[in-house]
Amino acid sequence: MWKRSFHSQGGPLRARTKFTKPKPKQPVLPKDKIRPPTQLTHHSNNLRITEPIPPTTSNLRCPDDHPLWQFFSNKKFIRSADDLPPSSHIRPWSIPELRHKSFNDLHSLWYNCLREQNVLARENHLLKNIVGSTHDEFSELSNSIRTTMWQIRHVLNERELAYSASREFLQDESERKKFLDTLANDYFLNKDIPDDEVASMLTRFQLAIFGISETIQDNTVDINFIDGIKFLANLKLQRFKDSNDLISEISQEPITDVGESFILFTSDFEPHAVQEACVAIKDLRKSPDNKVPKLDELPTVRKYLKQLIHASSVEQATA
């Protein structure tokens, strides 16, 4: 029986479509009718072959603000021994000296030491590869800087341990109140200590105990922040109560309202500023509606801080 198939004895049969039809050949045009190209080349006709430029350092231009300049001292390839400070002037910072420095000072000193260490490491590497040895002056300076850096870490570790121990100690409310009362009576209310020194101590105290930063924008309003402004408000009243009758009158009872506390908290640490704050507090007490409820303390103080930040930014913009 015959079967239909794509194959036959003569070979495969291919289906023809309109796409498989051979295209008719185009007639060959005479040369005079061929259109010349509209563009002869994609390159500029003004290019000329010049001599190659040898790669030298004079052909390189490095910007003055390039970060790798931090690995050079005054843009010198390598310093001589005369460029280094004399050995009699080289000594590391001692731990007692570093204990008097603030965190920002220690931070800056650390990175200055790190930058100088990078410069010395590069120069020592060059000396080993070019000269084959190192100079004692470079090694002595590097060791001194290294000693300063580990002593900075020692001081920071001391502060971290002291901070952790104090946080654990202040978790006990009775011990916390006893500590604050002792500190206030012995230092903050001591008339033998000048007001400017007490103000400087209070700046560090409020940050360590209550987390209140001197920079307004860095503060987070929480329960500890509320307790801090109330404590500082009453402390200012007790400090300057003998300088003015109005301050003495307001200080008869502790300040408990957060609105009144915020007025005293934002006042300067001087009798005249505290007196002006007491005048504002007396005006607030004329209406009982001005008292801030306990449940509204956090949102109210957040609103006060936003207004204070806005006023400060406007003042800086117009200055």
Swiss-Prot record:
GO BP: mitochondrial translation
Pfam families (alphabetical): MRP-L47
Keywords tagged on the record: Mitochondrion, Ribonucleoprotein, Ribosomal protein, Transit peptide
GO cellular component, one term: mitochondrial large ribosomal subunit
Mitochondrion in keyword set: yes
Subcellular locations according to the entry: Mitochondrion
GO terms for MF: structural constituent of ribosome
Sequence segments annotated as region (Disordered): 1-55
Compositionally biased region (Polar residues): 38-48
Additional observations: Present with 7700 molecules/cell in log phase SD medium.
Protein family: Belongs to the universal ribosomal protein uL29 family.
Quaternary structure and partners: Component of the mitochondrial large ribosomal subunit (mt-LSU). Mature yeast 74S mitochondrial ribosomes consist of a small (37S) and a large (54S) subunit. The 37S small subunit contains a 15S ribosomal RNA (15S mt-rRNA) and 34 different proteins. The 54S large subunit contains a 21S rRNA (21S mt-rRNA) and 46 different proteins.
Protein name (record): Large ribosomal subunit protein uL29m
Gene: MRPL4
